[in-house]
Amino acid sequence: NCCPIDEESCCS
């Protein structure tokens, strides 16, 4: 997890 929430656009 790169962000507090699991979003595909978070790390992408």
UniProtKB/Swiss-Prot annotation:
Record's keyword terms, sorted: Amidation, Disulfide bond, Gamma-carboxyglutamic acid, Secreted, Toxin
Modified residues (4-carboxyglutamate): 7
Compartments where located: Secreted
The record's account of how the chain is modified after translation: Contains 2 disulfide bonds that can be either 'C1-C3, C2-C4' or 'C1-C4, C2-C3', since these disulfide connectivities have been observed for conotoxins with cysteine framework V (for examples, see AC P0DQQ7 and AC P81755).
Top-level taxonomic group: Eukaryota
Single GO MF descriptor: toxin activity
Transmembrane segments: none
Tissue: Expressed by the venom duct.
GO cellular component terms, A-Z: extracellular region
Domains (record comment): The cysteine framework is V (CC-CC).
UniProt similarity note: Belongs to the conotoxin T superfamily.
Identification of the protein by name: Conotoxin tx5h
